[in-house]
Amino acid sequence: LCAIGITHSLGIKLHDIAKALSTADGVKGRAEVVRTDTDYTVMIDYAHTPDALENVLNTVKEINKSGKTICVVGCGGNRDKGKRPMMAKIAVKMSDEVFFTADNPRDEEVKDIINDMLAGLSEDEQMNVTCIEDRKEAILEACNVAEKGDVVLIAGKGHETYQEIKGVKHHFDDKEIILK
């Protein structure tokens, strides 16, 4: 909106501004819709805090009135363990199906991170979660269960093109997984 105001004040016609904006890509990794040939939508977002996850899930709910929301989410290793149960609670509360998986586990075991996430949920809530440690497998399975009109949100890594495991950054790109 600010860009529109500035360019218009410089004498550029609104029609030309609208035309230019229609071809502009959004911010990579922020509510980024990945164009696929499927009848469901895949969105990638960097949401790696409880607030960010809640905000992007609210956005998904606003644009997706009829289909299911399927959320793939993990939490980073060697980072604030206190947010893990909060992230889990938000994902389960705001999604129809949830997959817990790896993010950047760093020096922690993925299963330990997932267990910290599960600790924030009741037994009934845990029944709505599928835990798949391998992020690629979790993404593929989430897409496999998606149906027409659903939105698959892949949260946590956004624009990142690596996964940090035991001090090594391995090439990993959520978008590449979706497009294969």
Describe the function of each predicted region:
Residues 2-180:
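ATP-dependent carboxylate-amine ligase
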